[in-house]
Amino acid sequence: MTSIDTLWLLLCAGLVFFMQAGFMCLESGLTRSKNSINVAIKNFADFGISVALFWSFGFSIMFGLSQGGWWGTGYSFVDVGGEPTLAVFFLFQAMFCGTATTIISGAAAERLKFSAYLLVAGLASGLIYPLFGDWAWNGLATVAGIETTGGWLENLGFRDFAGSTVVHSVGAWIGLATILVVGPRQGRFPKTGKTLKIQGSNMPFSVLGTLILWFGWLGFNGGSTFGLTPEVPGIMVNTVLAGVGGMLMAGLISLLQDKMIQVEPLMNGSLAGLVAITASANVVMTPIAMVIGATGSAIAYLVGKKMLHWGVDDAVDAVAVHGGAGVWGTLCVGLFGQLPLVDTGLNRWQQCGVQLLGIGVCTLWAFGLAWVFLTLLNRVFALRISPEDEEIGLNVSEHQATTETYELFQVMDRQAKTHDLSLRVPVNPFTEVGHIAGRYNQVMDAFEARHHRSVEDLAQIYYVTAAIAAAIENNSFKADQLGLEEVTNRADELGALARTIQQMAEMLQQRDQELIAVKQQLVLQQQKQHHGNGESVDLSP
């Protein structure tokens, strides 16, 4: 490996690492704000776990000296000192391991315990990913000077250029096993039989994440040549066009189905196109790349719809995008790959058969082992958070990380339960929630002031009524004792006082109704703003 090749692979490793930020933005924006911090920290933590385990023994299993094509040995706790080629190869592959692991995060978002997710991440990066990676990619280690004989799938002719199956499908199948074990989010599939759409908290943030992923994909596919070769520009063009094809197909489907172009299908469609081309970006012609991306997008859409029909709740459609499109992309090596470039010596039907074998083995291995492990673990250690914690949100229940919205709801809940009108919401004047909190405090100031005036008016009425009653009882009712002037007779006096009391009571009742209407209008605005996020606010008196 030349110096320029080493530099190129280092740059591509950085681009793949940047994809972690893309996944974090995408998943945080597609989930509710009460869970966004949890989603972000999962993407951060799983990277640390995956790289640590991959360095400890995962790299050795995947790229060590092959033991009959089933696992590798000899490179545990790998020391790359003085071997730049080995160092850059390890770094690049460690980033791939992190990508496969973080796909799981989005699928099972909003109901999985943080500690349980760390166990899933450890299983994925420490065993499932490196072992299947050995079967399909062990021979790549020769680039780093490791004398190995390749994995058994690889030796049969299975080809997956940059990981449609090895990376993306592995993560998707583990994610599918996880969400089947923990079940759907509360309210996702109500008893009415209809699927409830849970709106994400920040679509622009998700679009930013999609663009970051697209940018990182250039390093993902471009670096899989392990050098700055003449094939790299064509691979990058195929990558971009497949993403574009996926986006255009998703926009067309959305327009036909929903009579408008929605945001989520565009994002998922472009990502599905990128996943699909990942297996064959180096062996297909440019027009075919766009077809592969567009078809992968359509397949991901159909898989996502079918999962909803089956009651499977994937928070970000990770299984459809990375699993469905990953299967299609891997099969495309046999369907559309230029056989001289595929270079396995197989004819097209044989190549398709080997690709299907690899897809099936990956599904059985990744999904099967993850499902068995998590099902058994769930019997002794609850993987899912409690319904109460799910209602509050994982930001608070798992990390004690409050938000302005949560603090606003806390104050409103306390006021509803304690009837303490003196409570006020903390105000940050530079945020939208801060503006809402400020208006809420203004309403409560007015409500409290009117409440005090109402109490004073009622006290005055009580005093006048008590004085009249006492005077009548003592037969000493006199107008001047009550501060009433020019009263002609006792009957007129009592009638006037009765009318005054009635008018004051009606005025107080009308004032209370106005205050209640103002408060209800504010609460309805709050509930409308957060209804799409699935956050409930208990404001019952």
Swiss-Prot record:
Record's subcellular location: Cell membrane
UniProt entry tagged with the keyword Transmembrane helix: yes
Example GO biological process: ammonium homeostasis
Cellular-component GO terms for this entry: plasma membrane
UniProt KW keywords: Ammonia transport, Cell membrane, Membrane, Transmembrane, Transmembrane helix, Transport
PROSITE patterns found in the cross-reference section: AMMONIUM_TRANSP
Membrane topology: Multi-pass membrane protein
GO MF annotation list: ammonium channel activity
Positions of transmembrane segments: 6-26, 44-64, 86-106, 117-137, 161-181, 203-223, 235-255, 260-280, 283-303, 316-336, 356-376
Major subcellular site: membrane
NCBIfam families: amt
Family statement drawn from the similarity comment of this UniProt entry: Belongs to the ammonia transporter channel (TC 1.A.11.2) family.
Protein name: Putative ammonium transporter sll0537
Organism the protein comes from: Synechocystis sp. (strain ATCC 27184 / PCC 6803 / Kazusa)
Organism classification: Bacteria, Bacillati, Cyanobacteriota, Cyanophyceae, Synechococcales
